[in-house]
Curated annotation (Swiss-Prot):
Function as written in the Swiss-Prot or TrEMBL entry: Catalyzes the reversible adenylation of nicotinate mononucleotide (NaMN) to nicotinic acid adenine dinucleotide (NaAD).
Membrane-spanning residues: none
UniProt keyword annotation of Metal-binding present: no
Organism: Yersinia pestis
Protein name as annotated: Probable nicotinate-nucleotide adenylyltransferase
Length: 220
């Protein structure tokens, strides 16, 4: 049964490996919520396919870290559907399922980083994304502004909106390039710091740090 929205508030989905989740994930999307009027962000820990490099933390640990990171913050909820599957699913399939749950009129957005935008044409059914949701693009340190293919550049230009209010006025179909803070924090660097016994203070929430310590994660 679709969950109908009476006020057509803008909801967004933000996926990632989250190995571990950190402020480089959270701070930009919190700023994005302020900028575009997001009412809610659903965090979606990804199922990692066997042929790709495996996370150091297992699925249960990654899910727990995400839950701890946003506990008590009403802006966020956590959706574990991808982790509960036996095999990975394509992003478009998850978004289509969420669209069915939320109903046809709910404005929905998918948050991606600038790095993902540059390679979006390699995604499964990438051109169908805007039939289901909006795309919100967060800037990333060190990434080029130019897109790889003329087709992708033309697609971006034809769907780009400058006014974030447009995102709440229709359920899908727009791309918004957000002016979010550039935080040079990466999960790779956090894992390296842990392996080397270096401090990770101020890089991730304290509750996540405590859990990492208790579980003995990312040790050399």
């Amino acid at each position: 049964m679709p969950i109908k929205s009476s006020d057509h508030s803008l909801y967004a989905l933000f996926g990632g490996t989250f190995d571990p989740i950190h402020y480089g994930h959270l701070k930009p999307v919190e700023a994005l919520a302020q900028q575009v009027g997001l009412q809610h962000i659903i965090l979606l820990p990804n199922h990692v396919p066997p042929h790709r490099p495996q996370p150091e933390a297992n699925a249960q640990q990654r899910l727990k870290m995400v839950e701890l990171a946003v506990a008590g913050n009403p802006l966020f909820s956590v959706d574990s559907r991808e982790l509960l599957r036996d095999s990975p699913s394509f992003t478009i399939e998850t978004l289509e399922a969420l669209r069915k749950e939320r109903g046809a009129e709910q404005p929905l957005a998918f948050i991606i980083g600038q790095d993902s935008l540059l390679s979006l044409h390699k995604w499964h059914r990438w051109q169908a994304l805007l039939d289901v949701c909006h795309l919100l693009v967060c800037a990333r340190p060190g990434y080029s502004q130019s897109l790889e293919t003329p087709e992708l550049q033309q697609w971006l230009e034809s769907h780009k909106v400058m006014d974030p209010q447009a995102l709440s006025q229709r359920p899908h179909g727009a791309i918004y390039l957000a002016d979010t803070p550039l935080l040079d924090i990466s999960a790779t660097d956090i894992r390296r710091r842990r392996h080397n016994g270096e401090s990770c203070d101020d890089l991730l929430p304290q509750a996540v740090q405590r859990y990492i310590e208790l579980q003995g994660l990312y040790r050399g």
